[in-house]
Amino acid sequence: YASMYNVVDSFDTHARIPEHFAAVDAAAKKAGKVSLISCGWDPGMFSLNRLYANCVLPEGKDYTFWGKGVSQGHSDAVRRIEGVKDCRQYTIPVEKAVEAVRSGSNPELTTREKHTRECFVVAEEGADLAKIENEIKTMPNYFSDYDTTVHFIIEEEMKRDHSGLPHGGMVIRTGVTGMEKEHKHVIE
């Protein structure tokens, strides 16, 4: 679309942003159009939070926790799997990791240590549930780096319990100030 229109895009597959930027940038420049990418929740608003916190605490470390909430992009990725009728995917911060960050200890955390993912899936009648679950749990850039739980539910349960789209998260920066780096700070 960047070759035909001015575009505002909330593309959020973090691992593929450089590739997406290159493609959109080339098309927009060639057509004389303007394109703004990665301007949603994260990247986007959370990126501004990280920028602000880095200005205040230039010596430190950033941590981003998403959720608890529905990821529309991840839910859509699951809905594209053969045999899936509907899905809501929740990203959930690991409380132990959040507490470690808030302590100011600057822990090194893997993706798996920071978040879990939980999927509520309505499958088509006769679908191979084991195959669907495996495809979800091994999907690169979405689930393979996380502990993921898959629940198969019926449509009525989806409508009753998972029709909303709650979302949230937090950006935390921990760092030090002072001539001897003697003061620990946390910005949240």
Question: What do these predicted regions represent?
Answer:
Residues 22-25, 45-61, 76-87:
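Oxidoreductase and adenylate-handling cofactor-binding alpha/beta cores
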Residues 29-54, 188:
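Short alpha-helices
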Residues 3, 11-35:
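Rossmann-fold NAD(P)-binding glycine/threonine-rich loop
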Residues 14-17, 38-47, 68-71:
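Gly/Ser/Thr-rich loops at beta-strand to alpha-helix junctions
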Residues 70-188:
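C-terminal substrate-binding/catalytic lobe of Rossmann-fold NAD(P)-dependent oxidoreductases
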Residues 7-10, 35-39, 65, 89:
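General beta-strand structural signal in soluble alpha/beta enzymes
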Residues 53-56, 61-65, 118-123:
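Short beta-strand and adjoining strand-loop segment in the mid-core
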Residues 28-31, 57-59, 112-117:
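Acidic/polar active-site rim loop that often engages polyanionic ligands
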